[in-house]
Amino acid sequence: RGLGDVYKRQAQAHHSAMRFAGPIRQEIGIRTLMNVLGPMTNPAGAKRQVIGVFSRDWQNKMAEVLRLLGSERAMVVHSDGLDEFRLDAPTHVVELKDGVITEYDIEPAQLDLDPRTPADLAGIVADSAESSLALVKQSLTDDTSAAADIVALNAGAAIYVGGIANSLKNGVVMA
């Protein structure tokens, strides 16, 4: 339901296996192995990815699977029970680069982003196409907003993993 939750919304349309599994996953209503496998079975064959996972227990395993599948670079992120970067808590990152897996924690302040409170972030949840559009516009026009920061953080991670920036911090600046 967040601003960048594209995979979950589009998986059924663009991934043949998810066409069948998606409705069953929704009916079950709990996290399953499909939440872990889905992002790693990218139909585009991406060799560089930023993937979120709901449990820190899965991060190293996912990074190792990505390495074995031939990924060149990847970041598997988790923060406070969620499968995404956070602005209100540290994010644990397991990074695959040049065949080597490393892990570290990152705080928003380390990336020159303002730490946010959960109340700050409550306003960046889209519950309709209209509110999603409003958030996108806000992220593009108000560079001090929480929406702009979360877009910069996620885009910055993609820029870094894509090899355009030499660090996550520089990726965030470029975004």
Predicted regions mapped to residue ranges:
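Short, small-residue-biased leader/transition segments that mark boundaries at the very start
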Residues: 2-7
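Glycine-rich anion-binding loops and their surrounding alpha/beta cores
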Residues: 9-175
